[in-house]
Amino acid sequence: MAKAYEELELKDDFMFSVIMRDPKYVKPFLETILRIKIAKIEYPEVQKNIDIAAGAKGIRLDVYVEDEKHTVFNLEMQTTTARNLPKRMRYYQGMIDLNILEKGDDYNHLKKSYVIFVCTFDPFGLGRHIYTFENRCSEDIALTLNDGTVKIILNTKGTLDDVSPEMKRLLDYVDGKGVSDTFTRDLEEAVQSARQNEKWRLDYMTLQ
């Protein structure tokens, strides 16, 4: 049974999507995860739908943003264990590429892209908070394909000391452990405010 709108948390797909529509939340979220500085966030569309061809499986992306360098970031919230998570990530990244490249375009026009899944479970059972995947040479692990694609799985149930304190606090907040710093407090205030938004309430009810 679906949650009442007033009970939604950041880890709920709908709430995550609406909160991350605001650059003042998605920008520090990405900066904390990737340990980079982003000058500007752009939203090509509020919620990205990609349908390449009739008969092909389309996708709706929770969060699709670009930075000032036109790097693409796709953020997805995943709260249920999914056996097909790796292949789903592969499909999403492929669809993003197909959406970017126009017919006849040079492959150099493909943008660097990150597909990031925030999971409230550990899909690999290794205790890591973050699993980062890039294409590498099996014979020489130091050699990357440098194809501009990165897949990241975040695990809110991580137990290892493998991420920054800021990222640990963020993942703990997503997992429902409460606020512990300025950013998680800002996120909680955004969630409380969103619960009072009548338009979003109606949008949520329409989806149920």
Can you annotate each of these PLM segments?
Residues 1-150, 160-162:
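Accessory alpha/beta interaction modules
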